A protein has these predicted regions:
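Conserved, well-structured functional cores that handle cations and Mg-NTP chemistry
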Residues: 1-167
Length: 167
């Protein structure tokens, strides 16, 4: 029997954090891509694009990261649920302050999913953009994200999407 290859190490604290999620990935390449994306997101590169992240983490090209995000067999809902359970375990019933934030990003063009001319709160005006509602927790002076939902304008719904008004 061939022993499974170990994932390439990154930085100790990223390796330790990502280890909590290892069982969500069916192969070592997917788990490595998960770790590399974490490395890229905390790096000091200006734009967090897949080509830029692949360079900063030492990959020859961005294809492994692109594959991980587009066709890899991991479940985003399961990952979110697992992450929230980890947070609940760490909090151990201690109270948090809950913050709900509606944030918009201006977007050029209309090819990005759910982009529409709509009110963008942080710009203070109506513009072409995408809006997300995010829930954060504050605990002992630390702020961390809990979950988010992209607002889906009725005109831009895909098959199977459900329309909900903005909160």
């Amino acid at each position: 029997m061939v022993e499974r290859r170990q994932a390439k190490p990154t930085v100790d604290f990223i390796d330790e954090y990502c280890e909590y999620y290892r069982n969500l990935f069916s192969d070592v390449r997917g788990f490595e891509a998960f770790k590399f994306l974490h490395m890229g997101m905390i790096s000091d590169i200006k734009r967090k694009t897949l080509p830029a992240i692949s360079k900063v983490v030492g990959l020859d090209n961005h294809q492994p990261l692109h594959h991980f995000l587009t066709v890899s067999p991991w479940d985003t809902k399961l990952l979110k649920k697992h992450r929230l359970q980890l947070i609940l375990n760490i909090l151990a019933g201690r109270p948090i302050i809950l913050i709900i934030d509606e944030t918009g990003d201006k977007k050029k063009g209309k090819s990005t999913d759910y982009v529409k001319r709509q009110y963008i709160g942080n710009l203070g005006k109506t513009d072409n953009g995408i809006v997300a509602v995010t829930a954060y927790a504050v605990f002992c002076g630390m702020t961390f994200p809990l979950t988010f939902e992209i607002y889906k304008p009725r005109e831009r719904l895909k098959e199977g999407d459900k329309y909900l008004t903005k909160p």
